[in-house]
Design a protein with these regions (language model features):
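Eukaryotic scaffold repeat domains enriched in small/polar residues
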Residues: 1-276
Length: 276
């Protein structure tokens, strides 16, 4: 399990809680921030390069030898053929240059230029350097199939693209991880509402949430208006960030203030060892 201690430093533990080593990723002077994905004894990630503003760069880090490459090998995503691309200029709410992509199979992906997208298929981890966020179509979310994107108009620095059937109210999944059987995701609705965009996504029309999609049963459980995965035990903190360990285990990460709150509210004798 890798726990972020600083922007470029991670503490590595085994599942018994034993400290193993400290992992140092590319320095803070190079990367303002990074989003890391651990799989197959490698760390994958990307970060904003300080001296180039919002330019993002992807890198791979082999564990535990520490061999770092400044960019990931580009592998074509499995069964994904691009049909068309639409660009949203200056969409600060999305972190800069933002694109929407329509694939031949009817699915849509969207994300920032060179953010580094990861897709697991056929036992391999695929990387694509253009689009990271995914618009999913799942049973239970009651979404209409996106047909085509077109330019709707501009407002200040924002340009707005929508589908023929209107993207407002649909789900955008900015974080997606899966363990082969389930997909864990956070989601937002109303992110294509222009009023919401210009108010930095703080309006009530933008609703966050999270959910779990069971690939085997095609069942979706969505928890709206809350980005935390609820813990089944009363009083226990909820998971707010999730990731996968290098050997495929699902790991929930908790906010520090929620851990402190749980320690204060749960009797010591009832607290699990990891909470103590």
């Amino acid at each position: 399990i890798y726990i972020r201690a600083a922007p470029s430093h991670y503490l590595c533990y085994d599942f018994e809680g034993k400290f193993l080593h400290t992992l140092t990723l590319p320095g803070e002077r190079t990367f303002l921030m990074g989003a890391h994905y651990f799989a197959n004894n490698k760390a994958y990630g990307y970060g904003n390069i300080l001296n180039e503003g919002a330019t993002n760069q992807a890198y791979a880090y082999r564990l535990p030898k520490g061999i770092c490459t400044d960019s990931l090998t580009l592998t074509e995503p499995a069964s994904k053929k691009i049909k068309g691309v639409a660009r949203m200029r200056g969409a600060e709410a999305y972190g800069g240059s933002f694109f929407m992509v329509e694939h031949e199979d009817g699915t849509w992906t969207a994300g920032n230029r060179m953010n580094g997208t990861y897709q697991s298929a056929n036992g391999k981890l695929y990387h694509k350097d253009l689009f990271c966020d995914t618009l999913y179509q799942m049973k239970g979310l009651h979404r209409e199939k996106a047909i085509a994107a077109f330019h709707l108009g501009s407002y200040g620095d924002y340009e707005r693209y929508e589908t023929v059937r209107n993207m407002e109210g649909k789900y955008l999944l900015p974080r997606v991880l899966h363990d082969g059987e389930r997909i864990y995701f956070t989601l937002f609705t109303g992110m294509y509402n222009m009023q919401s965009l210009t108010k930095k996504l703080q309006t009530k029309s933008v609703r966050p949430g999270c959910g779990i999609y069971n690939l085997r049963t095609d069942e979706v459980k969505v928890q709206k208006d809350d980005i935390y995965f609820k813990h089944p035990e009363e009083g226990m903190p909820n998971a707010c960030v999730y990731t996968l360990s290098t050997d495929g285990h699902w790991v929930a990460v908790y906010q520090a203030e929620r851990l402190v709150e749980a320690r204060e509210n749960i009797p010591t004798e009832k607290q699990p060892e990891w909470l103590k």
